[in-house]
Every structure is written in structure tokens, then in C-alpha cells.
Amino acid sequence: MIEKSNNPFLSIDPIVERTKSNGEGLPLLSEKTKKGFDFTQIVVYLVGLSDGLTHLASLAIYYLFKDYFRLTPYQVSLILMYPYIPFILKPVIALITDSFSIFGMRRKPYLFLFSLFQSLNFLALAFLNLSVIQASLILFFISLCASFCTTVAEALVVESSMGQTYSQGTNKVTEFIASKAIGSLSVAYFSGYFLEKMPREYIFIATSIFPLIISLSCLFLKEKEYSTNRNIFNQLSDLIKFINTPIFLGPFLYIFVYMSGPDYDDAFFFFCTNKLGFRPSFMGTLRLTYGIASLIGIIIYRVFLKNCSLRKTLIITTLVSFPIYISPIILTEHINKFLGISNELFVLSGGFLIEAITEIQLLPLFILTANICQPGLEASVFATILSVKNLGSLTKKGTSSFITYLMKIDSYNFDNLSLYILTCGFFLLFSLTLVPLLPNEEHIEKLKNKETSKG
């Protein structure tokens, strides 16, 4: 899961600096909010935090399909494809929220309704006796609600970044992403610990509380009312025109190819639990280290890499990540025993480094969007970038399931797992062939001059 700026992107001054730097003209932020206490940012952080906190249920969901429904690795990969579908539809969701108002508002009602619906779906997992299909459908609805909520929050991030300096915009984007990482970090260990101490139904009930906090907090969100809706077809035309430039198409293709290759995560989860005997509490500890790594990746980017070019950042991080990514082969072939490294320590260190690199690769594209997005398309453009990533993730689940099945890897047969890990590693390197398609400083400067001349 890796994505992300001579940062050609980072050399761009926000186009909206053609307007007033205090954010005047932003469509959805009230004057009171701009001048006084910025409760909008608080809500944004709460959405990110809640999105991370709902990971409390992630291990319980894994074990639900693995132990309760007794599915094999390739079946679990297939099931976990469906929750990605709503995130692929983020541009559609964003166009809806950008175009259609509810009671004259385009953010607050969507945030309230879908966070409430998400909470109800977690309660359904806890209280209903479900079949595999029904449980999969509920996971789909949980993801649909999360997709709506994060799309609204991302639009608010972009809106609040417009009209500000690049540094201010960078801070807002990274703070939103960090709030997600903090949420995941807060519950990572307990996702496994609680699974050993209590029934998974209690975990689903506890998780349902976090979206409810969003529903309550957004009641205090100040938003300007709109008397009319925008034409969604005009919005779609503007969106296509805006993203149909080399500055976006190259990164879009790179991210999709990078994300769509097979990944050994699901098969390796079965290996760790069934072969190595790792308990849920250790799997929670593993997720805790991933949360810490995400924060460290964000810090490294902000301190050391935000002035590096996009191409350089992606090439270096991909090459560095390759040996780390295939390092579980040392575990599956028991080489770590000869090196005197325990199974647990080896798994913790490798996953930690991969997660940090993932965050470093994601950030430049997010920051690019926040700084050059034209007014009226805030949610749509940001969501399109994430949709490309999630389409790749959906494809990844499909290719992972297919190759896992071909290699006859199941719940207890891991004879070909090392070959599978190596295959996934080479798919990772394949994305480097698309680096020439990424924008350089000249392309960035042309876009900058073009947009400036429009102003």
C-alpha cells in the first residue's frame, strides 16, 4: 500500500493566491469560522481520528471470516474486495456533495447522516446472526459511509487550504492524515488484546461509538447555506477538464499500477496465525507498530523530503522498500533462526519500515491537489486521486486472490508462500517503468503560468 513531491508539486504556489490570502471567497466556510475559533478543522480532525479508531474492529473482522466462517486466504481476499468499491466511487460521491445541497448545505448533512448510518452497521455486526454474504454486505455499507464522511472531510481540508501559503496548506493536509494515523495508533494494540479478552460482538459495539461522535460534533459545524444546486454535468465536465492534464494523468497511472499488483498480506496473516501461532494480542501489537510508522513517515516527509522532486521521492522509496517488502521470505524459509532473530521481532521491524515508506509516497499527491484545486471542485479532485488509489487496491485484492489460488496456498499449506512474496515484489518494481510519465518542473511551471494568466 504505497503512494505519494523537485516536488514539482511543491514548487506551485496555490492558484487561489490570486484571490485574498485570508480565504475570502471560500464557498463553505462562514466568516465567523474564518475569523474566530475554527471548529471546521476540529470536525475534520475528528473525522480522521474516527476513521482510524474504527480500525479497532479490523482484526475482529479478519477473525470473523477466518475462524467463524472458516474461509481460506483467497476467499478472504475476495471478500475484502467489496469494501474497496465505495472508495472507488469517491469522485461520484464528491460530485454529489459538491453539486447537491441538503437544506442548503453541502457538507454538514452528509457528514451527519452517513456517520450515523455507519454506527448502525457496526451494531448490526454485533447483534445480528449473519451469513457470509450478509456480513460482506454490511462491510460494504460501512465502507460506503466511511467514504462519504472522509470525502466531506477532505473537501473541507482543501477548502481551508485555498488562499493560504503553501506551507499552511501542507500543514493542513498532513495534519488530517496524521489524525487518521493517531486514531489507528490509539486502538491498534487493543484490537488484538480485546479479541482475546472478550467476544468480538463487544468490539463491534465499542467501534460503533466513534462514528456517533462525528454525528454529534457536526451539529456544531458552521456552514453557509446555498439557495440553488450546481449542475452536476457541468461539474463533471469541469472535473474531467481539470484532471485531464499530464500533471495528474502521469501520477494517476503510476499509483494505479503500483497499487494493483498482488499483495501477500492476507496469505501472510494466515501464515502468522496458523503456522507461527501468533495470538490476536501480538497481531494487535503489529498494527500498533504500523500506526507509529505512519506518523514517523509523515514527520520524515515534512522535515526532510517536502522539497524533493516527485520522481526522486518515488524512485528512492520504491527501491528502498523492495528488499524490505520481500524480507518475509527470510521468515517463511526460517532463515531468521540462523540469524538469531525471533519470528515476532522480524515481523515487527519489516512491517514498520514498509508502513513508514507508504506514508512518504502518498503525501505529495495530496498536497498537490490541495494547492492547485479550482474552487467548486474541492471534493471531486481530491476524491479522484483517492479513487485511483482505491481502484488499484481493489484490483490488488483480485490479483492476490487469483495468484494465491493458483499457487495452492490455503489455511495450512504455505509451500509456495516464498515464491508468492517474491512475485509480489517484482510487481512492485514494475511501477518504476512509469516514472518518465510523472510531471517535471517544466510542466508544473506551464500550468502555473496558464492558471495565473486566467486570473
UniProtKB/Swiss-Prot annotation:
GO cellular component assignments: plasma membrane
Transmembrane segments: 42-64, 84-103, 110-131, 137-157, 177-195, 201-221, 242-261, 281-301, 313-331, 347-367, 417-438
Keyword Cell membrane applies: yes
Subcellular location: Cell membrane
Regulation: Transport of folates is inhibited by probenecid and methotrexate.
GO molecular function: folic acid transmembrane transporter activity
InterPro entries hit by this protein: BT1 (IPR039309), MFS_trans_sf (IPR036259)
Reactions mediated catalytically: folate(in) + H(+)(in) = folate(out) + H(+)(out); (6S)-5-methyl-5,6,7,8-tetrahydrofolate(in) + H(+)(in) = (6S)-5-methyl-5,6,7,8-tetrahydrofolate(out) + H(+)(out)
Keywords: Cell membrane, Glycoprotein, Membrane, Transmembrane, Transmembrane helix, Transport
Glycosylation sites: 307, 416
Principal subcellular localisation of the protein: membrane
Membrane topology: Multi-pass membrane protein
Function recorded in the entry: Folate transporter with broad substrate specificity. Transports folic acid, folinic acid, pteroic acid, dihydropteroic acid, the folate precursor p-amino benzoic acid (pABA) and the human folate catabolite pABA monoglutamate. Can transport 5-methyltetrahydrofolate with low efficiency.
Entry's family note: Belongs to the major facilitator superfamily. Folate-biopterin transporter (TC 2.A.71) family.
Full protein name: Folate transporter 2
